[in-house]
Design a protein with these regions (language model features):
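N-terminal periplasmic "start-of-domain" segments of outer-membrane beta-barrel proteins
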Residues: 31-59, 86, 94, 127
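Periplasmic-side early beta-strands and strand-to-turn transitions of outer-membrane beta-barrels
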Residues: 158, 181-281
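N-terminal periplasmic accessory domains that precede
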Residues: 64-67, 85-88, 100, 114-117, ...
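Extracytoplasmic beta-strand/coil segments of soluble accessory domains associated
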Residues: 65-105
Length: 685
């Protein structure tokens, strides 16, 4: 173990040495190193993490799950490459994370969560995290927080195009194309991403052992076999069309249309001894999201209207070959989701010290879920699932007051309705104070109550749904300090960071438990106390003319403990850390750039996670901690007709053998090469 760690350190030092010897390119300008003490009034007391465009546009193969893994300290739970990836803040569950795209909530209404592996980072222009109480400014239900994703209307003037081709390990192919047109009034953008791979990476299967025999058939040893990821192929297609029109009189109109077509096999578990040719385990999805928007900006009054529609068709098919040539369908699950969306936002600035906001959001869901393979003995079809509709309304009002040049106060009142059930009023209070202009030292604090209604599966899924479930609710407290400073002379640099304490008490936590009838059913059983620290540090400096070093790090300590009553004398979950919640998580990104070269190092860490509520420290009861390192080297070339971008990415640099989810192996070291072509339509040759 010691030699292994030394080996990794030596390789890392060699990489850093090589990077210092290789020129690297800089997209960041000196102006980004200048820090001012002014912060927007809309962010009074808000705990927010914002991702820059370099992280989002690093390479076309990245999903938002990858960006969040290496760019923040939230927990990303991944079932493998190109499989379900969910996000959880502050020791909560994925359903406690709300996700919006251009203001429209995109959480799956059946499950209550979002699969971030299906969101290409190249389709996102703005991304930020609102931690804890700060999510109440946007929506209710975010007991952990909110992920805000969006696109922007600004494109370069004239006709512009970009094409990127990626070729990687495991016969992986990634393609991206974008075509834009812009003038004083119109902004038009079309983006396309296509990714495919057999995804048959090799791994060491620690859940199996192969015995070694001598000539007398006595066992003299054993080893863990090397296997390939079986049934893991995928094909993902994404198309994003945007049209914006600026009337130049304060009115702006927009259209966003996003289509996703996904065809993915579900990989076999490491404990499965079957032959992948004997079965099919496949999930398909077709999703369309569309938004029409109108924004009106005046001197003191601004408002916006949005209307949207989401359609999702999902299919899960599982079949096995019982005898040679005789394949039997076991499951043919089909789900259809239709969601209609409407939103109004208004902002009034009567003076420089006051901002008032009013918001109203509506989501109408229609969901049909069934298994077409279930047949009763009489021959009639039996629906396993449900066919339900639910209206979800959320209204909010806020007042933000800049009491003095140093002190800001904010209050938010929110009211939510799901179906015919109204939640108690959700209050939230925020405050911040500028302690020192030197260093821009800011103190922030907030408190809020929040509610999370059960998902449609929780209430109506057959068999097991529980329509009598109560909403989860709790109080969250935040307090933190941050600083930002910098200079342009004599050595240009900027340094920023922050530390936040949070404390959350959530009652009536929903969990699915086994019943005497042979299936699982959800119940309100837990009271959870989640608390801890979140820290961040950003450093950027120019050691010499044209050089830039940029470091960004984050860390979270998140104990999340079950404080409820014992369900039975044998219940050992009380007082224990929740399953699949790491106590420690961290990330680090370092960029070295000079002229047209760029070297990037990314690192992520998760501490051990328990797989059972009793926190049993057994072979299958916990997952070891793991460290992940990725690097990339990029070169930009400029010619008269086109610009070229060349990039080599190395993922899992140290060939870490790890699991994010029990019995779900992850790939070892792998490579991908990208070439980008940008024609110069509008530039002088």
């Amino acid at each position: 173990m010691f030699m292994n760690k030394c080996y990794k350190v030596i390789i890392l030092l060699c990489i850093v040495h090589c990077a210092l010897c290789i020129p690297a390119w800089s997209q960041k300008q000196l102006r980004e190193l200048v820090v001012t003490a002014k912060r927007p009034m809309k962010d009074i007391g808000v705990q927010k993490t914002t991702f820059d465009s370099l992280a989002l546009k690093e390479n076309i193969a990245l999903s938002m799950a990858d960006v969040l893994t290496f760019g923040s300290s939230v927990y990303v739970k991944s079932y493998g490459r190109a499989t379900l990836s969910t996000i959880a803040f502050r020791g909560t569950s994925p359903s406690h994370t709300q996700v919006t795209w251009n203001g429209m909530r995109i959480n799956n209404p059946m499950l209550g969560m979002t699969d971030f592996s299906t969101i290409p980072a190249y389709f996102i222009d703005r991304a930020s995290l609102l931690h804890g109480t700060s999510s109440v400014n946007e929506t209710g239900g975010g007991l952990g927080g909110l992920v805000s994703l969006g696109t922007v209307a600004d494109v370069d003037s004239g006709l512009n195009a970009q094409y990127v081709q990626g070729i990687g390990s495991f016969s992986t192919f990634d393609e991206f194309a974008r075509l834009t047109y812009g003038d004083d009034r119109w902004s038009v953008s079309t983006r396309v991403v296509y990714s495919s791979s057999p995804n048959d990476y090799r791994y060491t299967n620690h859940d199996k052992k192969v015995n070694i025999y001598d000539d007398d058939h006595n066992i003299i040893g054993s080893y863990h076999p090397r296997e390939r990821n079986r049934s893991g192929a995928f094909r993902d297609f994404h198309l994003l069309q945007e049209v914006y029109y600026n009337a130049l009189n304060g009115n702006r109109f927009g259209l966003n249309a996003w289509y996703t077509g996904s065809n993915r096999e579900l990989p076999m578990l490491t404990t499965d001894y079957g032959d992948e040719r004997d079965f099919e385990n496949r999930q398909r999805e077709n999703t369309f999201r569309g938004i029409l928007s109108w924004d009106r900006s005046g001197e003191k009054l601004r408002f916006g209207l949005r209307g949207g529609y989401v359609h999702t068709w999902m299919a899960y098919d599982y079949s096995r070959e019982i005898t040679e040539g005789n394949r039997v369908n076991m499951t043919r699950s089909r789900s259809r989701i239709n969601t209609f969306f409407g939103r109004f936002d208004g902002t009034y600035n009567p003076s420089k010290r006051w901002i008032f906001t009013l918001g109203l959001t509506a989501h109408q869901h229609f969901v049909r879920s069934e298994d077409k393979q279930i047949i009763l003995q009489e021959g009639d079809k039996d629906i396993v699932g449900y066919d339900k509709g639910r209206i979800e309304l959320s209204a909010s009002a806020s007042a933000k007051w800049q009491a003095t040049d140093r002190i800001g106060l904010s209050a938010v009142i929110r009211e939510d309705m799901f179906g015919d059930s109204w939640a108690p009023v959700i209050p939230a209070f925020f405050a911040d104070a500028l302690l020192s202009r030197a260093g821009n030292i800011m103190l922030r604090a907030s408190v809020s109550k929040n509610h999370k209604f059960p998902s449609l599966n929780d209430m109506y899924f057959l068999p097991g749904g529980n329509p009598d479930l109560r909403s989860e609710d709790g109080w969250t407290y935040d307090a933190g300090i941050s600083f930002d400073t910098g200079s342009t002379k004599p050595l240009p640099f900027s340094v920023g960071g922050g530390l936040t304490w949070f404390d959350s008490h959530i009652s009536d936590w929903i969990i699915w438990l086994p019943t005497t009838k042979g299936f699982f059913s959800p119940r309100n059983v837990k009271d959870v106390h989640s608390y801890g620290l979140e820290g961040r540090l950003n450093v950027a400096f120019e050691p010499a003319r044209g050089w830039l070093v940029d470091l960004n790090g984050s860390y979270s300590w998140t104990p999340s403990v079950n404080r409820g009553e014992k369900m039975s004398p044998a219940d050992q979950s009380v007082g224990r850390q929740l399953p699949y919640v790491p106590r420690h998580s961290a990330s680090l990104t370092g960029r070295l750039s000079w002229r047209s070269w760029s070297f990037l190092y990314k690192w992520a860490y998760y501490s051990e996670r328990y797989t059972m509520s009793s926190n049993d420290y057994t072979l299958t009861g916990h997952l070891p901690e793991y460290f992940m390192s990725n690097i990339s080297l990029e070169k930009n070339l400029s010619f008269r007709p086109v610009d070229l971008q060349l990039k080599l990415a190395v993922n899992n640099l140290f060939n870490e053998d790890y699991l994010s989810v029990l019995s779900r192996p992850m790939p070892g070291i792998n490579f991908e090469f990208f070439i980008g072509i940008t024609p110069k339509f509008n530039r002088k040759k």
